[in-house]
């Protein structure tokens, strides 16, 4: 009868509402790729993924997960990964190794994950997270060259000597060179979808675009044995470039050469 149908519809609505609420009671948070949130220039083509779960109830147990990786943000946001999709049972959420199609150097990728609880309820997809690979092959650096300050004839500048603890250091000393600075102008005439800068310096450097320092790091890059390896730092400069003229600048420091 009509009354029974109303109660049936109401019961179904309550069940659907309860199931939807239960799925929202837990979610994936704190995503990490190679221990970092949205890392730039990772030095591996088999990155590892980790995450945590925020749940209303104590004692939450993850029973399964589904992880996707792709090169299109919109597709991953819609739950589609064209490079890798894995679904596995278990509570693993640390260091899940990538095992999909081969990744390429210097490209940006996107990933997301969702999990199930012990009752078989599934969380929403995690907000899309990104990572980019570094320049890991020698060919990727084929167009790069070292830039150095030219030695000037008057590079040896003499200044008056000083006394320290009443001991004369000398009549003359050699003053150090000023910090070398390099600049280059580029012209941007089309909309920029993505722009990366990979910068290295023997010693330390600071990188500038249009007069503003890029990044908040200090004493880049990491020290290394320059006879064996030289480190570099990746910067996402997509939002730094403007239409028209742009000025790129680098200021160098002695770094380990001053030790």
For the regions a language model picked out, list residue spans one by one.
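Positively charged n-region of N-terminal signal peptides that target proteins for export
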Residues: 1-7
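Bacterial N-terminal signal peptides
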Residues: 9-18
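Pro/Thr/Ser/Gly-rich low-complexity, intrinsically disordered linker/stalk tracts
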Residues: 23-58, 128-141
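Exposed beta-strand and adjacent loop surfaces of beta-rich binding modules
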Residues: 30, 48, 62-66, 194, ...
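Surface-exposed loops/turns
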Residues: 43-44, 100, 105-106, 242-243
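Accessory beta-strand-rich segments of carbohydrate-active enzymes
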Residues: 51, 89-90, 94-96, 107-112, ...
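Recognizes extended acidic, P/S/T-rich segments that occur
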Residues: 60-108, 114, 118-126, 139-152
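An acidic-aromatic loop/edge-strand motif
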Residues: 134-172, 251-259
